[in-house]
């Protein structure tokens, strides 16, 4: 076995008909976790339906259909491997909750593959003001996906004919846009591919001798392995708190950043309760330390179940402990709201595991969704489709962190049984409260 392979999560973005499914399907098909039997079954079904040539996208469509019907789908189907890395495709747009998923941290991507339709008319539609190419790229950058690969697809199309001039034209225009968003185009590989025929996907294409760069798989293998946030201070949002006979109080949650070890002194926010951790368990086994991504239960001393609850955040008392937020500034996109939203609007905010009403205290500026430029200072109202910077005030004590410090914590606002807005927290004003320190914690000081 030797060294373990690096795990990288990818999101595949791009305009509706850019060929994301075919391209993704092709990678999974060629390097992936789908067994031959499943592929043969899909191929047979595809040819029976007269979709023989559509087999790569068909693979993905089958997976999506199973996912939509909530059949818990074997996640191996969304994986593919190279010599160096294991890639998991965590979401592909077209899935209706894509934007929401990207934001609320159900999917923290390490890198994005932006698929572009290079055909005449197709490219222009995707990059136009209403196209999704720009929006997806901006969203990826805003949400902290700092590595990008651009796959200029459909180079086999009769309007493109593997043309170097078309490649240069697209590269120039998309680079300009990515630069505006915040990416450094020098570091973004542009790869002319055919997701359908496989040109430059895994092997260099014989149809494009003029292109001397990496194949798509080569570029994926060149991605920087993600730094897992175990070196950041501990943040562990609580999902539940149990009282277990003979053991005591056991909060449960997923470590988002940092590490948790038995013997640590933790502070819970927003109530500032400080105590010692007796033991940490995952799947009924004791751990010497829990790292980001681990779902753990931990036993705390001298704390009653009434003292802490879901939505609280555990942190290390000696290393930038979490605090209650007095208010915070968020950049939000209004997704669906029937009317106008003004100052004073108070939807329920979901961030990590907490679920608390937050007031739009001041809508500070309305911004352009695609460029991030200010359009209007202190607008009276914002409506569906608008992006804005808003000062928000929690209506009950809550703990949130800025997105740059603790990326897994994006926010979504709900009202009328739907997601009204999604966004990221830019900065937080924290309250300096004093809270109860248990005897166990005092002894450890």
Curated annotation (Swiss-Prot):
Ranges for region G3: 91-94
Residues of the tr-type G domain: 5-230
List of residues that carry N6,N6,N6-trimethyllysine: 79, 187, 306, 396
UniProt keyword annotation of NAD present: no
Keyword GTP-binding: yes
PROSITE patterns, sorted: G_TR_1 (PS00301), G_TR_2 (PS51722)
Keyword terms: Cytoplasm, Elongation factor, GTP-binding, Methylation, Nucleotide-binding, Protein biosynthesis
Residue list for modification N6,N6-dimethyllysine: 55
Binding residue positions for GTP: 14-21, 91-95, 153-156
Region (G1): 14-21
GO cellular component: cytoplasm
UniProt xrefs under InterPro entries: EFTu-like_2, G_TR_CS, GTP-eEF1A_C, P-loop_NTPase, T_Tr_GTP-bd_dom, TRAFAC_GTPase_members, Transl_B-barrel_sf, Transl_elong_EF1A/Init_IF2_C
Region annotation G5: where it falls in the sequence: 194-196
N6-methyllysine PTM positions: 261
GO molecular function: GTP binding; GTPase activity; translation elongation factor activity
Primary residence: cytoplasm
Intracellular or extracellular location(s): Cytoplasm
Region (G4): 153-156
Start and end residues of each stretch annotated as G2: 70-74
Role summary: This protein promotes the GTP-dependent binding of aminoacyl-tRNA to the A-site of ribosomes during protein biosynthesis.
Family: Belongs to the TRAFAC class translation factor GTPase superfamily. Classic translation factor GTPase family. EF-Tu/EF-1A subfamily.
The protein's name in its UniProt record: Elongation factor 1-alpha
Source organism of the structure: Euglena gracilis
